[in-house]
């Protein structure tokens, strides 16, 4: 499976003969650790032989346009690595829907479902910012996150828009042998 990951230039220099690189957990922002840990649990369930490391993030589609900003801090020398990874070692998810996981939100497939769930939730839960939430609300939210992987349902949903869907790909190990192209750039 072809994917692209945006990395600082120094990542390539970390490779030694046959070495495998794993994502550094120190780079996971504390406020999103719950989401990254949830993704690790999903990778454990869905990727054979997954070893529990934090994921590398990449794009499955579309290929990142290096003329855009936001990939790295402005002025940073970076590179877009084109990778070819065994499909069984990659977990695809919808980038926009992923933000509900990051923000501990309920991932609805329609406006009606979203509004109905939130009406019930707001009537029943006093502290909406507590985490974990009381049951069954916590389980409802976490279960809804599984929809981040249902690319067909999200694409078919008017609620998630008709435009291009950005599909991200997570994988555990970055191998030099998987790198099939390197495009250097300076972040805007």
Q: Language model features by range: what are they?
A:
Residues 33-42:
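An acidic/histidine-cluster motif and surrounding catalytic segment
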Residues 2, 9-30, 52-54, 64-78, ...:
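Conserved NAD+-utilizing ADP-ribose enzyme module
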């Amino acid at each position: 499976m072809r994917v692209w990951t945006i990395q600082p230039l120094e990542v390539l220099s970390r490779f030694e003969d046959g070495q495998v690189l794993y994502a550094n957990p120190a780079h996971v922002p504390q406020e999103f650790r719950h989401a990254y840990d949830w993704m690790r649990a999903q990778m454990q369930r869905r990727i054979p032989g997954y070893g529990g490391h934090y994921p590398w993030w990449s794009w499955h589609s579309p290929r990142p346009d290096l003329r855009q900003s936001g990939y790295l801090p402005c002025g940073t020398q970076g590179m877009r690595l084109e990778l070819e990874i065994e499909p069984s070692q990659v977990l695809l998810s919808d980038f926009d829907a992923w933000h509900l996981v990051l923000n501990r939100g309920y991932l609805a497939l329609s406006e009606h479902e979203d509004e109905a769930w939130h009406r019930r939730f707001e009537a029943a839960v006093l502290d909406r910012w507590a985490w974990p939430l009381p049951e069954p609300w916590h389980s409802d939210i976490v279960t809804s996150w599984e929809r981040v992987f249902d690319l067909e349902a999200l694409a078919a949903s008017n609620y998630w828009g008709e435009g291009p869907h950005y599909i991200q790909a997570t994988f555990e190990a970055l191998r030099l042998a998987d790198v099939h192209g390197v495009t250097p750039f300076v972040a805007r």
